[in-house]
Curated annotation (Swiss-Prot):
Superkingdom of origin: Bacteria
Keyword field contains ATP-binding: yes
Name used for this protein in its record: Regulatory ATPase RavA
GO cellular component: cytoplasm
Protein family (similarity comment): Belongs to the RavA family.
GO MF annotations in UniProt: ATP binding; ATP hydrolysis activity
Activity modulation comment: ATPase activity is stimulated by ViaA.
Subunit structure: Homohexamer. Interacts with ViaA.
Coarse class of the protein's main subcellular location: cytoplasm
Organism of origin: Salmonella paratyphi B (strain ATCC BAA-1250 / SPB7)
EC number: 3.6.1.-
Entry function: Component of the RavA-ViaA chaperone complex, which may act on the membrane to optimize the function of some of the respiratory chains. RavA functions as an ATPase.
Amino acid sequence: MAHPHLLAERISRLSSALEKGLYERSHAIRLCLLAALSGESVFLLGPPGIAKSLIARRLKFAFQRARAFEYLMTRFSTPEEVFGPLSIQALKDEGRYERLTTGYLPEAEIVFLDEIWKAGPAILNTLLTAINERHFRNGAFEEKIPMRLLVAASNELPEADSSLEALYDRMLIRLWLDKVQDKANFRSMLISQQDESDNPVPASLQVSDEEYQQWQKDIGAISLPDPVFELIFTLRQQLDNLPNAPYVSDRRWKKAIRLLQASAFFSGRDAVAPIDLILLKDCLWYDAQSLNLMQQQLEILMTGHAWQQQAMLTRLGGIVQRRLQLQQQQSDKTAFTVIKEGGMFSRRPHYTLPPEASASTLTLLLQKPLKLHDMEVIHITFDRSALELWLTKGGEIRGKLNGIGFAQTLNMEVDNAQHLVVRDISLQGTRLALPGAAEDSMPAEIKQQLETLENDWRQQHTRFSEQQHCLFIHSEWLGRIEASLQDVGEQIRQAQQC
């Protein structure tokens, strides 16, 4: 077996070769390649003339000796046109019912069936057996068929509650394609002279029969770690609780997990990673509504839970809350406290300064800086006699902001705990404290918790960085996940700096 990273590089180069000359079809080619390498089926939905058949033809070149079968279904299609005509000689000479399958679906590795929903019941029933069991009943004998990839296409979805649903459920990967959108790509497509029948894949990249068979065994050996299973189960529960969510059978879940194993294997990993779960968005939808729903649910899972983003933010919220509690406790201890005076029947309570405030001028620190009179203020200097007068009779109180300039009018009050509180123009307030009493440093408990959280964030970011090299995942998803992790990291850093 090739080294995992060499295999991943080879599959990447193989995909690039298959994508050559096809515009805005990279994701479709890659997922069809993944389906072919893992023996799954694909449904392509989209209008006529958008290279659906060309995608299927290209996949033939991924293998060294692959045969292809292509057919356009109509309401009048017969099993003979898909599975081969009856052998007149066998029927006449030996009385045997036998089909001549050479050149037809039973002997093809790559199969493309266009307008699939127009197939009649006789074709559908035989096709179901071929997809499920990779067997074809030819007369009295069961023949194993070599089909590695079935690509079915249509410009419409099957009708609900129809006989077509059983076949639709067998199409594991479902892709919704559209016309070429980008102007430059559209121009390149128009002037391209590439022959669509040419083989764009070097022989050194093509997959041999022996490699293909060995890889099927290797895919099954890829592990599903418990944390990844928990994410899958969470998604399943979310879908079960949504009223408009599509029904996903146990069979489809099982086949989808094998696809995730294949994604991990061909990305050079020995275990399914959270990044592989993004593929589920192309496996679990049924119609346009459920397609959008799956996109939303996967985005919630990937940007909120797959790398512990929401859990880390919850922990951060708890740490910040604990820090506020400690700060409040410290604030109560260090705040400048005045002495309440006055009789029971006084209209207005009045206060006196504590004994330790004996100097003729008092400098009091703001426990939290405020912007007062267009200045960032960290301490205020008061004339002791003016402060005593204000505490006794009320009225206007002035103080020098940061101890400089003229004394400025202040919005100050005594709170219920007999602490002096100064407020800014938006009425945000902070208590005043004597110099030497304020505690500005972060509590050791909080500092340790934030450092631990930051280390956990770094581990999650490293995990994502190591796993993001996945050929089958669109780069837009990687950008969203990276942004979600960076947002968590920024909030942690801001908390450390406060």
